[in-house]
Amino acid sequence: MAASTRIAPHRNRWLRILGVSFVTYVLSYIDRTNIAMAIPAMRTELGISASTIGFATGMFFWGYIVLQIPAGRLASVWSAKRVIFCLLLFWSVVSFSTAYVHTEAELIANRFILGLFEGGVLTCTIVLIRKWFTKAERARANTVFLISIPIAQVIANPVSGLVLQHFGWQMMFVVEAVPGLVWALVWLWAIAETPEEAKWLDPQEKSRLMAELKAEDAQAGPAQGHWIRTLWHPAVLLLALYNFAALMAEWGVTFWIPTVLKETGLSIVTVGFLAALPPAVGAVMMILVAFSSDRLQERKWHMIVCTALSGVFLLMAQLAGHSTIGILVFLTLAVGAFLGRFGPFWALPTEVLPPAVAGVGIGLINGAGNLGGTVGPWFFGQVRDLTGSFTLALTVGGISLIVGSLIAMPIRQRKAS
């Protein structure tokens, strides 16, 4: 862009829309995953088995599924901004209340309600990105937003470990819930629903962007029939099945990595810092894969290769035996490859579906993935209770990722014009 038309950094849509969305999802992801660091202490203090912890963790995803399609529909036809604002307030309050659970039933109910209010956030944000970024930008835009996932883990695990060490697991939930209540006000002030509504956007940038987005919408065509037909669109069904298989493995690994490392004899603070390594590598992979995907305007094979490699690395983790370094290396490679898929993966449904129904399709895809998320943590916990190790669980997780890659192969991506 020429110097005469360059806009101020604080008005740049990449910083404003994606920056605020990034922080929002960091807070969301910390509040949903910090329980992974608290599991060893909660099991000891509350007397809860690994399988029960896994079941309670899985209940988060049952709640998460409920609002996927309704939130996606509301984001498409009403307001993604307002839906996310409400969800942000509610999930922060529920996360705060986790500090006060005393029984298995209370923990299970708390995780379900937390999932209910976090459920629509990703779906609504993907719809918001669809309203703000062109097809040529979308994998990178999705990645800037979704890189919040590994960054949240990099931040949360060490911080959670330090708070746990000095103040206990209850204070960890309190300290990490409060920022969400404050950030809700920032979200309401900073975000505009569309470029047309953004008073802070440079007029020339606004005109150019609106023209490009309208041209892409025209190319995608109008939705055919009732929006509910989107639920059995071939690409939506294949992506939903793929995401189920992928997230079953990913969430199983994510929630139990701290426990796997803790069982090698490490302190909780050391576990917190080491558990930050896999998502840090994942953040780098997300950037590299997103740039490649946008440069080549190719989504499907970037997604498939990353997912298959992640499965292979999980299978290879069996070679590490009881070596802390070996386990960490293979889990880091697996998580890094898996996170690399996110940018192209979430660009696909916005490119194969008309804008008016994209939110519904994204909701189903995300909901199916998080149904897999109910299975993964529970299955890993059951295997740990029955066998005394996570070996079988990692094997099944690796196979699930490879099967997911095969499921995605028939998807047809629309050629870039």
Spell out what each predicted region is.
Residues F145-A198:
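Helix-loop-helix hairpin linking two adjacent transmembrane segments in secondary transporters
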Residues I35-A36, R229-M286, F342, W346, ...:
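Extracytoplasmic gate region of multi-pass secondary transporters
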Residues G47, S79, Y100-E106, F117, ...:
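Helix-breaking motifs and short loop linkers at transmembrane-helix boundaries and internal kinks
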Residues V66-A105:
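Conserved MFS/SLC helix-loop-helix module at the cytosolic interface between two early adjacent transmembrane helices
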Residues R299-L348:
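C-terminal transmembrane helical hairpin of 12-TM major facilitator-type secondary transporters
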Residues N110-S148:
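Cytoplasmic helix-loop-helix junction between adjacent transmembrane helices
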Residues L67-S79, M285-E298:
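Helix-to-loop junctions at the C-terminal end of transmembrane segments
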Residues F90, V94-S97, A105-I113, G326-L333:
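Paired small-residue
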